[in-house]
Every structure is written in C-alpha cells, then in structure tokens.
Amino acid sequence: MDTFESVKAVVVEQLSVDANEVKPESRFIEDLNADSLDVVELVMALEEKFSIEIPDEEAEKIKTVKDVVAYIEANK
C-alpha cells in the first residue's frame, strides 16, 4: 500500500468520511468537515501509524491530504 492509500485509510477512519471524498487535494477543514480537534486527533493517529513525530509547527502547515503524504515521505 502506498503512502497516499495508507493516509487515506487513517483519514477515513478518524474523520468518518467516505473514502471517495478523500483525494490528494482534499482540505481537512473545508472539504472533509474536520474541526481543530479532529485535526489534532488525525495528526496523532498518523504519528502512530507511521511511527513519526509531527511537531506542532509542522502540523499547523498541514492543510490537505497531499501535505500529509509529502511530510511523511520526507520524514520516514
């Protein structure tokens, strides 16, 4: 499974959204109806799934699914 598909699976589970709604350009708050707490929980789930740490400064920059994928690819 590639990074996007793995991230997508976490997003679907954490945000309770349909898998078809999760695209690389999907914005968590605007497109997937996440609130700030959802985003924090999503970041924590991604950290656990990929065994990485996403500092708060970096987490604040993550707005879309592709932002997460790029961060994970650069830091794994």
Curated annotation (Swiss-Prot):
UniProt's post-translational modification comment states:
4'-phosphopantetheine is transferred from CoA to a specific serine of apo-ACP by AcpS. This modification is essential for activity because fatty acids are bound in thioester linkage to the sulfhydryl of the prosthetic group.
InterPro entries, from UniProt? ACP, ACP-like_sf, EAL_dom, PP-bd_ACP, Ppantetheine_attach_site
Q: List the disulfide bonds.
A: none
| Recorded superkingdom | Bacteria
Its Gene Ontology cellular component terms are: cytosol; membrane
Q: Name one Pfam family in it.
A: PP-binding
Which residue positions does O-(pantetheine 4'-phosphoryl)serine occur at? S36
Keywords, A to Z, come to: Cytoplasm, Fatty acid biosynthesis, Fatty acid metabolism, Lipid biosynthesis, Lipid metabolism, Phosphopantetheine, Phosphoprotein
Chain's role: Carrier of the growing fatty acid chain in fatty acid biosynthesis.
Name the record gives this protein: Acyl carrier protein
